[in-house]
Amino acid sequence: MKKNNYKIVSLYSFFSFQENSIIELKQNLLRIEKENDLSGLLIIASEGINGTICAEEKIIENILNLIKNIVGNNQLNIKVSYSKEKIFKKLKLKIKNEIVTMGVPEINPLEDAGTYIDSFNWNKLIKDKDTIVIDTRNHYEVSIGSFKKSINPNTKNFSEFPQWVDNNLDNHLGNENSKNIAMFCTGGIRCEKATTLLKNKGYKNIFHLKGGILKYLEDISKEESLFEGECFVFDKRVALDHELKKGSYSICHACGMPISIEDQTKVEYIEGIQCHFCINKFTDEDRKRFEERQKQINKLKVKNQEISNN
């Protein structure tokens, strides 16, 4: 495949997804995967669709047309990037209760989400002294990049966010209930639910970054950007820089934490087995399993390199 010939589309939409349409889409996607070089991860639920797909441009367009026919008049939020190689091993389709798991089934982003702020007006909003900025992502995502002076809820997963709101948000607001609350995430989907949650709890002046960090990095020049670091993504690229190209981070295959080039020079780091985040987390038996897995990965790398050289 030629340079940057993989088109990557991150997408989501909230809409009433009927069971027969879910089954039909799943069958069509599996058929396309069987006949083409398609990979990705799509999560499907009765509330909509969420995920990322990776393939040649014409295949991507065919899939988007399928999805748009189902979504109908509801907005399909899309972010596009490109890669020299596949960012997933294969296509995974998951049918779940929620397309992004918050664990608060009564909220509906279609009815009561916050106010969108586009990339070009975001800087002005978060610079306002009467605005607090909340990063709704998980702690390991925040650790490698975020907007200046944003609040880190330090959650392990998104389902912890409602409890953080109950325990902490009023402390950040103080007695100033008129403050703006600006929220952001990777692509926008978590903020659809996070802003709806806050509005349902009676908070006012709730805003969220339309298209998330990915759209902001696409729209705003590096010189004007208030985003610092890299943006974590849930695929082989691990993180993206301001040009939406693969960044400098890798993943520790033992604990799943993003690790920098500097982290990989630390004495605690052994590729595929441990890093400084997890050195005390696993048993010797675990590490033996990780070591064997890494041996198999290395063998596969050598084999693939030999094939590409021939």
Swiss-Prot record:
A GO biological-process term: tRNA modification
Domain of life: Bacteria
EC number: 1.14.-.-
Keyword list, A-Z: Oxidoreductase, tRNA processing
Rhodanese domain residues: 127-225
Catalytic activity of the protein: uridine(34) in tRNA + AH2 + O2 = 5-hydroxyuridine(34) in tRNA + A + H2O
Active site: C185
Keyword Oxidoreductase in annotation: yes
Disulfide bonding pattern of the chain: none
InterPro entries: Rhodanese-like_dom, Rhodanese-like_dom_sf, TrhO, TRHO_N
Family indicated by similarity: Belongs to the TrhO family.
Function (record text): Catalyzes oxygen-dependent 5-hydroxyuridine (ho5U) modification at position 34 in tRNAs.
Name this protein carries in UniProt: tRNA uridine(34) hydroxylase
Source organism (scientific name): Prochlorococcus marinus (strain MIT 9515)
Lineage: Bacteria, Bacillati, Cyanobacteriota, Cyanophyceae, Synechococcales
